[in-house]
Design a protein with these regions (language model features):
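Long, intrinsically disordered, low-complexity segments
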Residues: 63, 101, 132-203, 299, ...
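An aromatic- and glycine-enriched ligand-binding surface/loop that stacks and positions planar moieties
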Residues: 99-271
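Single conserved hydrophobic/aromatic residue that forms the stacking wall/gate
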Residues: 1-8, 13
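C-terminal substrate/ligand-recognition segments
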Residues: 215-352
């Protein structure tokens, strides 16, 4: 694209270069927080390369910060680019995450405030788009209709992927429902109280559940925390919060579904068309696999029309990468690291007010919960949007680099990052499964260790790199071949 700029058009060149810097910085943000130290590639490759060496993640971050500072200066605002293109706000948003990694909390506050007060982006608080006249819906529902995400009146999106039906390059759609919904149609798993097979996800049933909500096989299963815990404050579950609202099916529970197996009607079973129950009146559990087949989900986010499938899995649709709501929560996080509890509470509450949440955080709440208050609101607002593992790893590294005490009473250090870290402690604290003796129906146990903060470097990448050495992460086989990683020292 740079070559297509007019000769002498310095502004055009800087715009395109800034966009490229953003894309690279985004990829390295993800890779370094998934894998840790990785090879650094700064030049275009035109032929096979087999002599990579691992570079420290810390030196990669410094390079990405420099690039993003350039990008934030030169990339245009969202109202001056086409949908899907990199925006100035997206560059600043990602830069804020890098600033947080570096402990540059004041810079993170400054750059997020520039986005929030910049006049281009604001939270969507009024009804808009294709369903705005539907009385039973709300602004949260509007924001996540695929046809509404890229509308000019949707001022919240900082960066989106554009995925439309029939668009060149479009493949199999998002498949969001397929991945995120419970496997309610698995044969013989969900029983009626009188012991019959209760559910079907076949197309064209008289009670067409699959057409209305989609077909899921539960590749991504929420914890109790995500379904219930995070929505319950002072022992009250907040169903008035638009993000957890059940009366208009923004949020779905299994009990809202009904037994729809056609065989029930054919046999005259009294339970046909009645609401699902997890337990019989005698206390017998009626679902053989509650891990994959029984949980709640945010229907307002997971429903993607799928015109090519009779059992909808999730068709094409625009998808948020960054939203202004997360920008507020990044600023709230920076305030938490600085101990400015009231300002953090105000930013969290801005998001909660828009969602019609009943409880508002006080400064004392945030001081007590610390980063937990931000993580809870991220879980509510950014369900199925944020890369949760990546963000938890980022926060774990901040704890280890700064030594700031955690809400759990612990402090962490970099030299023991793969042995003792916040990522592991938070996952084990919140999860229903890991290291708690929970077993799948197939006999597998859910286990987790601190070194899983970083994923293993794939053996095929290491083995194919015959002219160099790519290090393996601690805890995985092959670390005996590691050498000290490179430190990128600048251009």
């Amino acid at each position: 694209e740079i070559a297509q700029c007019l000769v002498g058009s310095e502004m055009c060149i800087r715009d395109r270069l800034g966009g490229a810097y953003f894309i690279r910085a985004y990829r390295y943000y993800m890779k370094t927080l998934q894998y840790g130290d990785v090879p650094l590639v700064l030049d275009e490759l035109t032929e096979p390369k087999v002599d990579y060496y691992t570079t420290t993640k810390e030196s990669i971050w410094l390079k990405m910060i420099k690039d993003l500072e350039f990008a934030a200066q030169h990339v245009p605002e969202a109202n001056k680019v086409k949908g899907g293109q990199v925006t100035k706000a997206a560059c600043k948003h990602l830069l804020a995450k890098y600033y947080l990694l570096e402990g540059r909390f004041d810079d993170a506050i400054r750059i997020t405030t520039e986005i929030i007060n910049g006049g281009v982006h604001k939270l969507c608080t009024e009804r808009f788009g294709s369903n705005k006249s539907a009385a039973d819906k709300d602004v949260i529902w509007d924001m996540f209709r695929i046809e509404n995400k890229s509308l000019p009146e949707n001022t919240e999106g900082l960066l989106l992927t554009i995925d439309r039906y029939g668009m060149e390059g479009n493949t199999s759609g998002t498949q969001v429902m397929y991945n995120a919904l419970p496997y309610y149609g698995l044969t013989g798993v969900i029983k009626t109280p009188n012991g019959a097979n209760g559910m079907s996800d076949a197309a064209k049933n008289e009670i067409g559940i699959v057409e209305k909500y989609g077909r899921g096989i539960s590749r991504i299963r929420p914890t109790w925390y995500a379904q219930k815990g995070v929505w319950t404050i002072d022992h009250v579950e907040d169903f008035s919060d638009y993000r957890h609202r059940t009366d208009n099916e923004n949020w779905m529970t299994m009990e809202m579904l009904v037994y729809n197996n056609p065989a029930l009607k054919k046999s005259g079973n009294e339970w046909y068309g009645k609401h699902l129950q997890l337990y019989s009146d005698q206390g017998t559990i009626l679902c053989k696999d509650t891990i994959r087949c029984w949980y709640g989900w945010p229907n307002y986010k997971t429903w993607y029309p799928d015109p090519d499938r009779v059992q909808p899995k999730g068709g094409p649709g625009d998808f948020y990468i960054f939203r202004l709501a997360e920008t507020y929560l990044l600023r709230a996080e920076a305030y938490v690291w600085k101990g400015e509890w009231q300002k953090a509470a105000e930013d969290i509450n801005t998001i909660r007010k828009r969602a019609n949440a009943q409880y508002m955080y006080s400064a004392a709440d945030v001081e007590k919960q610390k980063i937990g208050a931000v993580l809870d609101e991220r879980a509510r607002e950014l369900y199925y949007e944020e890369p949760r593992k990546v963000e938890l790893t980022r926060i774990a590294i901040i704890y280890a680099r700064t030594g700031i005490p955690c809400y759990n009473g612990k402090t962490y250090t970099l030299d023991r990052l793969t042995e003792d870290n916040f990522w592991y402690d938070r996952v084990v604290e919140i999860s229903d499964f890991y290291n708690k003796g929970v077993q799948t129906p197939y006999g597998n146990y859910f286990t987790c260790s601190p070194f899983h903060i970083f994923w293993p470097i794939p053996s095929y990448a290491i083995n194919a790199n015959s002219g160099g050495i790519i290090n393996q992460n601690k805890g995985y086989p092959g670390t005996e071949k590691n050498i000290p990683p490179l430190v990128y020292e600048g251009d």
